[in-house]
Amino acid sequence: DLDPQGSSSEWLNERPLNKSKIRGSTKFQKPLKKSKNTVVIYDVPAAVYGSRLDTYIKKADMIVVPVMPSPIDIKAAKEFLNNLRSMGPVIRNKIKVGLVANRARANTNIFLELDTYLVREKGLKYITAFRDNTNYIKSARSGLGIFEMGESITAQDREEWRPLVKWLEL
């Protein structure tokens, strides 16, 4: 969890002991070592540029960029993605970059604007859209992932996650 907001760390702190073990680390702790059987997810702050972005990219095989349906987020995403495209590993296609619409309300004008923008991003994959709903609040409070929560209440969320899981090849 490299984001000062600490959302990932907070989620891990809420995780029940009887669930699969997930190790966490913050930028203030010794970094986790990645083995061939390990997936390491870095939660980084928004609007990272320059040498900090370069440092994060060197550790990545894939980058998922969530974008919320708001004029400010869309503008920030355009700037970030233009910067990201100029980075060597992205130019050489050594890193896959995927886009996710986050907290989407499908039938709103701003979501349609975001959806159109993400579809048109050249060289980047628009993977899926996650709807805005309370299951993510429940997930944050319980330390559970969507696929660990009740199937009947998360069925639509699971469908929205499947394209991302497939893209990540998890």
Task: Tell what function each PLM region has.
Residues 1-58, 140-144:
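P-loop/Walker-type NTP enzyme "switch/lid" segment
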Residues 4-6, 71, 104-107, 135:
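Conserved nucleotide-binding/hydrolysis micro-motifs of P-loop NTPases
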Residues 8, 41-43, 65-68, 99-102:
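Conserved beta-strand segments of the P-loop GTPase G domain that flank and frequently precede/overlap
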Residues 51-71:
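Inter-motif core of Ras-like GTPase G domains
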Residues 75-103:
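Conserved C-terminal guanine-recognition region of P-loop GTPase G domains, centered on the G4
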Residues 105, 115-147:
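Beta-strand-loop-alpha "switch" segments that mediate conformational coupling across diverse proteins
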Residues 145-170:
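NTP-binding/hydrolysis catalytic cores, primarily Walker-type P-loop NTPases
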